Amino acid sequence: SRYTDNLSNTFWLNYTFFNDQVRQSVSEGRYAQRPVIYHRWGGLGSHRYPIGFSGDTFSKWTTLGYLAYFTSNASNVCYTYWGHDIGGHQGGRNDQELYLRWLQFGVYTPIFRTHALKSNDIERRIWKYPNFVQLREAVRLRYRLFPYLYTAARETYDTGIGMNRPLYYEWPEEGKAYQFEDEFMFGNDILVAPIYEPAQGG
């Protein structure tokens, strides 16, 4: 902290947030058996307390492209459970192709969550889009992957290696594994290469 020597801002924020959640739960007669803190990227060392996400992003193709890279490298800074606001948090318009590609990408991340600012200009409910059938299929694929996700989560728990990881974790001697920064492994058996550009001709 810039105010107190040897005090981590992330630790203090999460400590305060967690205690407030516990206080609210107890006062309402609820007792969380497995509480979770979901926190944006806070720098090196912030992986120790929360599940991480990329922060409030813009609904743009360039953002989706960057998140493919950012997600593949989350393991490098010890984020084993990582996510992002599927569809983007703010800005842009309701682009059905962008939302589909983002949702498909999100299927292969540990945290699968749509989210945005509360705004009449941003829609995240899949049934409101003309390509609902395709969006629904992506969600169904995520559900079909639950046994795989559970196995990958257990391996992450046992090894400390993230569910998403760069290709060079699997093939450290292969030079090309360092070149494809926007591709990553999802668990041991799925290689993900997200589409983050619109189709030619719209």
Model-identified regions with their sequence ranges:
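Catalytic-domain carbohydrate-binding cleft regions of carbohydrate-active enzymes
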Residues: S1-G202
